[in-house]
């Protein structure tokens, strides 16, 4: 069985085939391995890994020198996520992962604007890094301890 990492890497390569010379896309192999250790639908694993990849890619775009191409690639990755989400056709999961995206963006904004207490910064970063897989796994696995 092909890993979620390998499947997504192939899909991204196909999506970006017409984009000349772009920075490498980092896919979180460890997250893929965690997702692959659970019996959840492949498209749910791909959706989770894709939104993680898109968000990390956009986070890596330098703030002072926003590359139009880097932003375009982030947008293409986000569009790929929404395509997978539509194919999955699970409105309940769609609502949960969409709410997770909103929460992650709000937390990132709070950090950026120094609105998080120093005592809460570690917890906030852990939430940002782990929320997508937690939402995905908890949605599909009834008795999971995350």
Residues of each region from the PLM?
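Mg2+-dependent prenyl diphosphate-binding active-site environment of isoprenoid biosynthetic enzymes
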Residues: 4-146
């Amino acid at each position: 069985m092909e890993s979620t990492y390998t499947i997504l890497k192939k899909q991204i390569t196909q999506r970006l085939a017409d984009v000349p010379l772009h920075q490498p896309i980092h896919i979180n192999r460890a997250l893929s391995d965690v997702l692959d250790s659970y019996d959840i639908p492949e498209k749910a694993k791909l959706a989770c890994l894709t939104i993680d990849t898109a968000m990390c890619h956009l986070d890596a775009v330098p703030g002072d020198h926003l590359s139009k191409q880097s932003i375009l690639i982030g947008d293409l990755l986000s569009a790929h996520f929404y395509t997978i989400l539509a194919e999955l056709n699970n409105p309940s999961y769609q609502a949960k992962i969409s709410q997770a995206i909103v929460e992650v963006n709000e937390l990132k904004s709070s950090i950026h604007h120094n609105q998080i207490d120093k005592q809460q910064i570690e917890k906030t970063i852990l939430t940002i890094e782990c929320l997508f897989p937690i939402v995905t796994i908890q949605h599909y696995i009834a008795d999971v301890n995350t």
